[in-house]
Curated annotation (Swiss-Prot):
Entry's family note: Belongs to the bacterial ribosomal protein bL32 family.
SUPFAM superfamilies in the record: Zn-binding ribosomal proteins (SSF57829)
Region (Disordered): 1-24
Protein's name in the database: Large ribosomal subunit protein bL32
The organism of origin for this protein: Rubrobacter xylanophilus (strain DSM 9941 / JCM 11954 / NBRC 16129 / PRD-1)
NCBIfam families: rpmF_bact
Gene3D superfamilies per UniProt: Single helix bin (1.20.5.640)
GO CC entries: large ribosomal subunit
Superkingdom in the source lineage: Bacteria
Comp. bias (Basic residues): 1-22
PANTHER family in the cross-refs: 50S RIBOSOMAL PROTEIN L32 (PTHR35534), LARGE RIBOSOMAL SUBUNIT PROTEIN BL32 (PTHR35534:SF1)
UniProt-listed GO biological process terms: translation
Length: 61
């Protein structure tokens, strides 16, 4: 079994982990209403996808 010969320093450990950060989802603007949404998905605000209404969304008053 492989065992480290020396203790890994905090600097070396943190340098290795510098690329482990998570990124937020890539959002795009809806061409119909302008709200931000996930790509390749129906807009939750207006219900449009690829230029047509896919889901009927009720207006909140």
């Amino acid at each position: 079994m492989a065992v480290p010969k020396k203790k890994t320093s905090r600097a070396r450990r943190d340098r290795r982990r510098s690329h482990h950060a998570l990124r937020g989802p890539g959002m795009v603007a809806c061409p119909n209403c302008g709200e931000m949404r996930l790509p390749h998905r129906v807009c939750p605000e207006c219900g449009y996808y690829k230029g047509r209404t896919v889901v009927a969304v009720e207006a909140v008053e």
